[in-house]
Amino acid sequence: MKICPTCGARLSGKATSCSRCGAMQPQTSGGPRESAMVGEKKFLQFPKETSGLEMSARAYNLTIGGLLLYGFAVCAILCFFFTAQISMLNPIAVFIGFLVCGLIGIVVANISNSAGVRFIGFNLLVVPSGIFLAGCLSTYYFETVVYALVGTALIAAIMILCACIRPQWFDALGPVLSISLVSVIVVEFSLRIFFGRSSTFIDLAVVIIMAAFIGFDFLQANQARRTLCNAVTFALELYLDGVNIFVRLLKILSRSQN
């Protein structure tokens, strides 16, 4: 039972209009569906940068795609045109430099509020990783490299498509994927210490985990605010996913050929 605020008539609780004066009656409850939608909206927000102008969805995704193309183009240039010069460098120094610059780049790309500074961090990862890959690719057959590239592209396309069609698959995967990746790294490190080698199963596990990370990172990118800073950061994360898959596929394919 409720009272019409216009004429004071008594109405049933489900009435949407007053039978005496015809005034529309306010609905007092939004119900569980409204509460669930509010909770879902709050849960789906993963902001990495909370200031700056927001871009359209199309411009935002094109920016991420353009940054990824730029990163892989830099890698390709270093691998195809500077392999001879890079192969003359000390491999241990190259690896250490890659790790140091990569870590600095990741930190810079995540803590700065300037898109330009984040782009510098992006390059601090892209260029050393290109140099590192150029030194590695000289030990593989050209066909193996091509197969690994095609495989990486197909995996990335499939996972992004899955993230678009079934985003709920990737919503809560972040902690699970992180724990899985750390566990695999620990196992691989132990194998190298005690047996002096890794395993194809480890490489397959990393490929599967990083493939899931592509879907997860793409979903996060489109749930965060569509700013230029976030576009750079998520492009870096997707770039890392792709490079890891490519390197592991190279190892798997080279073992199968041998």
Language model segments and positions:
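A hydrophobic alpha-helical transmembrane-helix feature that marks the membrane cores
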Residues: 2-12, 16-258
